[in-house]
Amino acid sequence: MNLVTVCGHNTTMLYHMLNHYHLHMDEIFVVLYAHHSKDPVIEEGLHILEKFNLQPHEIIVDEPFNWERVTEHYNRVKSLKPDDWWIVADDDELQLYSKPTWEIIDECEEFGYEFVTGGFVDRIGDNGDFPKITMESNVWKEMPEAGFFRYPMSKACPNKVTLMKGNVQVCSGQHYVQFEDGFTSWGSEHPKRYPIKKNFTQVHHFKWDYSVLERLRQVSKTKANVSFAQEYQLMYDEIEKSDFKIDLTKPEFMFQRIGNGNYHQLENWEKLRKKIVSI
């Protein structure tokens, strides 16, 4: 099993992301996505990769906040090993599975499934704050509140394709599989999809640290993707209304305090699964 990630804009979570996955991978492919040749993401990324005895698969200089381009890199890298299994994860996404991934892969091989899906669990700090994360942080404890606030606040798609064969193509944002006939894997069932009642991957999203507010402002001004710009502006506006905190008391956010990475502790996951696959 291989891992591919694209790291751009900042490296806040890259160390924690690699630390989460590296012991379980045969090979790790990191694409450093810089916005210019002097972008600090290059030097910072190289420094973090050294801690895992890794070299970047590629260093790319390209337009900032172009998620279609990012998805192209994911699909291209996976195609290097089309028959292998791959975890695809952004650098702020820590995936949790209902059982060891090798068991899921064995079942996929036996029954002909080619991809596994899941959805976002939004992580935030104590009292709904956006904490400062460093390499020394324990991110599960620094961001102990697990909920579902991004979609209610901005209508951002919460679906993710998390584990797949290398020849499986994903669409922008890695939200769904893109099939050759033009259709996607939207919905709760597909003959090539591992049954979601057996596993619906929790994608714990550690995007919401202290640096995200400035990033929301920057993306809202980008011309690379108007729909993403509008979504990020809406998210920023909603956060501003609540005094730059996330309201932990709102029932629709379904918050639960979980200071570790245990799939089976998230009490609302079945309820969330049904909601996410309907979006």
Spans of model-derived segments:
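Mobile, glycine- and charge-enriched loop segments
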Residues: 1-6, 12-13, 71, 83-86
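Active-site-proximal specificity loops/subdomain of glycosyltransferases
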Residues: 36-89, 96-97
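Short, well-formed alpha-helical segments that are part of the catalytic scaffolds
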Residues: 10-24
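Residue-level recognition of beta-strand->loop/alpha-helix junctions
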Residues: 32, 60, 117-119
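Catalytic-site signature of metal-activated, phosphate-bearing donor transferases
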Residues: 67-73, 97-279
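Short, flexible loop/turn elements at secondary-structure junctions
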Residues: 5-10, 34, 93-95, 120-122, ...
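Hydrophobic targeting segments
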Residues: 1-5, 20-21, 27-32
